[in-house]
């Protein structure tokens, strides 16, 4: 299915793909933006849980219950642009610049839980040492 995205919505070098499991309903860009196909609009993102600082988007899930679900934007981006062949090993998604609002595909990488924990601890120690 092709969707004509409004020209004012497009950014240079931005690539769009269907959201995995929501084909034809939602599209995601390499910049971490989510498009609702029905109304051809960029969906708003929000911090559902302020302490985590991750951005979420509310997707309407068409199943037996017909409900909406808050989904992490970085997970949507990675699942759509970089499918995970080894879900047992690479369980976490890391923001390279540590900015959880930067969901550009170039800022995301899959890691094991152990690798991710080590990176985050080193980053926190580095931040603490600067204070």
Model-identified regions with their sequence ranges:
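Conserved recognition-core residues within compact binding domains
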Residues: 2-93, 97-131
